[in-house]
């Protein structure tokens, strides 16, 4: 189960500590492009929204900080094919890491947002909004197909969208595969950004133990309870073996991000235990880049926040010659 992240051209082995980040942010109207740009600006990126396409190279060629450029159907001279051509030209710039971000949401969600804000859809002058959403989806389809990261905001509240962007782009890390390990609860919905999902609901549930119920998979008593299930060693071993096979292949094909999600009934005990164990073991066995941990349901309840299991390397401490 995946929100497919597509490979980008260029070097993908290790980190390019000296690279400047250039992000092209596009997507459907109402899907959160402006919100993403605001977060990137807070993270220190220079943000330019909707410049004429023929100015993109000039903007990117200027020396300076990381750059985020917003592009959508309102951009002067917009054609998806032209945007992709400009993207390939950007990737020829020296010492630049160039990525395409695409924001999307379900049509009914977009319709609800436009209705709530009373904004006019850029492709609709009169009548209902839905035909405009469908037309824009078709116009932007080539960009979504080539995006390095697709962000579906259908059920992503603004604070979680901000957290997602901060975890992806708030570091100074360079090229490489960033792995996100996420626990979640199935009743709250599948994480749309997940590339791989594993279901841990068949394991013994600590929820039904009165002593363990208020605890989480961050507590040792819960960890030992979950691991005592006879099926746990084989289940975890299969997940570990699969990730040790797949993640290096993701690196080889140029993926920039991989989200591995583990789900259970409440997102509190079993899935948290497994994510924590993966975060402990995988950095020793899989040669990828930064690795982050997010316990979605615990974060929503204020019981945990995202953290780096393997932080991005600090360019100032790079000792390579």
UniProtKB/Swiss-Prot annotation:
Displays ATPase and GTPase activities. The keyword GTP-binding applies. Pfam families: PapZ_C, RapZ-like_N. Belongs to the RapZ-like family. SUPFAM superfamilies: P-loop containing nucleoside triphosphate hydrolases. It comes from the Bacteria. Keywords: ATP-binding, GTP-binding, Nucleotide-binding. ATP binds at residues 27-34. One of its GO terms (molecular function) is ATP binding. InterPro entries: P-loop_NTPase, RapZ-like, RapZ-like_N, RapZ_C. GTP binds at residues 72-75. This is Nucleotide-binding protein GOX0815.
């Amino acid at each position: 189960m995946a929100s497919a992240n597509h490979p980008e051209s260029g070097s993908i082995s290790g980190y390019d500590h000296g690279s400047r980040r250039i992000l092209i942010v596009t997507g459907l109207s109402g899907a959160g492009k402006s919100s993403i740009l605001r977060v990137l600006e807070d993270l220190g990126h220079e943000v330019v929204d909707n410049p004429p396409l023929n100015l993109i190279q000039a903007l990117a060629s200027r020396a300076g900080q990381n750059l985020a450029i917003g592009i959508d159907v309102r951009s002067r001279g917009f054609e998806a094919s032209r945007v992709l051509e400009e993207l390939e030209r950007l990737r020829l710039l020296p010492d630049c890491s160039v990525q395409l971000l695409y924001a999307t949401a379900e049509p009914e969600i977009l319709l609800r947002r436009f209705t709530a804000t009373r904004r006019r859809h850029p492709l609709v002058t009169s009548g209902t909004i839905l035909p405009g959403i469908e037309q824009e989806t078709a116009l932007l389809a080539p960009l979504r197909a080539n995006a390095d990261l697709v962000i579906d905001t259908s059920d992503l509240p603004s604070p979680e969208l901000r957290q997602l962007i901060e975890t992806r782009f708030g570091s100074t890390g360079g090229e490489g595969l960033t792995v996100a390990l996420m626990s979640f609860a199935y009743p709250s919905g599948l994480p749309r950004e997940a590339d791989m999902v594993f279901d841990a609901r068949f394991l013994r549930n600590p929820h039904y133990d009165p002593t363990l119920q208020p605890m989480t998979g961050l507590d040792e008593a819960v960890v030992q309870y979950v691991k005592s299930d006879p099926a746990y060693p084989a289940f975890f071993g299969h997940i570990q073996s699969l990730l040790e096979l797949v993640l290096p292949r993701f690196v080889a094909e140029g993926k920039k991000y991989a989200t591995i999600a583990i789900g259970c009934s409440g997102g509190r005990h079993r899935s948290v235990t497994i994510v924590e164990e993966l975060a402990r073991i995988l950095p020793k066995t899989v040669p990828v880049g930064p690795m982050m941990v997010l316990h979605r349901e615990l974060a929503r309840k204020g019981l945990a926040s995202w953290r780096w299991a393997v932080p991005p390397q600090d360019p100032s401490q790079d000792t390579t010659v």
